């Protein structure tokens, strides 16, 4: 009797395991768009003269785990404005790809650079506030930023 009940539940167990095996790899995997937002967007943070901004943000955004990320840029503009860059001037990316776009207007950014002699786990960054055009790589559907390629000064 117990064996019959166990055998009746076997197909259900197999189905559950198959679904878990299919869904599980995507659980916890950050999309490229979400990674871009985590690493580069700080819409709420207004640029300030806080000299520890980069040290704090790089740690808070998990970019000092296992190593010190040498360079990072935070953009202090609304996410929708940064996403709109994907439909502005098409430029060639540093790696030669053709999916980069340059913002039509300058944006408030913070440039974070690892200081000389700084080593993991004591990552120390130099914080620089700038107003620059940004260049981002875009992909997907919807077409959104997935990589911060560069920032450039106004060419006027």
UniProtKB/Swiss-Prot annotation:
List the signal peptide residues: 1-28
Annotated region (Disordered), positions in chain: 33-52
Q: Which reaction does it catalyse?
A: an [RNA] containing cytidine + H2O = an [RNA]-3'-cytidine-3'-phosphate + a 5'-hydroxy-ribonucleotide-3'-[RNA]; an [RNA] containing uridine + H2O = an [RNA]-3'-uridine-3'-phosphate + a 5'-hydroxy-ribonucleotide-3'-[RNA]
Chain positions recorded as substrate binding sites = 35, 38, 69-73, 94, 113
| Keywords on record | Disulfide bond, Endonuclease, Glycoprotein, Hydrolase, Lyase, Nuclease, Secreted, Signal
What EC numbers are recorded for this enzyme?
4.6.1.18
Q: Name one GO molecular function term.
A: nucleic acid binding
> Origin, by domain of life?
Eukaryota
Q: Which GO terms describe its biological process?
A: defense response to Gram-positive bacterium
Xref: CDD domains: RNase_A_canonical (cd06265)
Q: Where is the composition biased (Basic and acidic residues)?
A: 33-43
Protein localization: Secreted
Subunit structure, per the record? Monomer. Interacts with and forms tight 1:1 complexes with RNH1. Dimerization of two such complexes may occur. Interaction with RNH1 inhibits this protein.
Q: What is this protein called?
A: Ribonuclease pancreatic
Biological classification of the source = Eukaryota, Metazoa, Chordata, Craniata, Vertebrata
């Amino acid at each position: 009797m117990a064996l019959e009940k166990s055998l009746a539940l076997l197909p259900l167990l197999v189905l559950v395991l198959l679904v878990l095996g299919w869904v599980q790899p995507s659980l916890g995997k950050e999309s490229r768009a979400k990674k871009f937002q985590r690493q580069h967007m700080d819409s709420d943070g207004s640029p300030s003269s806080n000299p520890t901004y980069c040290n704090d943000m790089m740690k808070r955004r998990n970019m000092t785990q296992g190593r010190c990320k040498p360079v990072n840029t935070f953009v202090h503009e609304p996410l929708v404005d940064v996403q709109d860059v994907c439909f502005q001037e098409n430029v060639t990316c540093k790696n030669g790809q053709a999916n980069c776009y340059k913002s039509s207007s300058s944006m408030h950014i913070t440039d974070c650079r690892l200081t000389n002699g700084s080593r993991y786990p004591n990552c120390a960054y130099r914080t620089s506030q700038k107003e620059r055009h940004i260049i981002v790589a875009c992909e997907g559907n919807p077409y959104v930023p997935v990589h911060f390629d560069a920032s450039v000064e106004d060419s006027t």
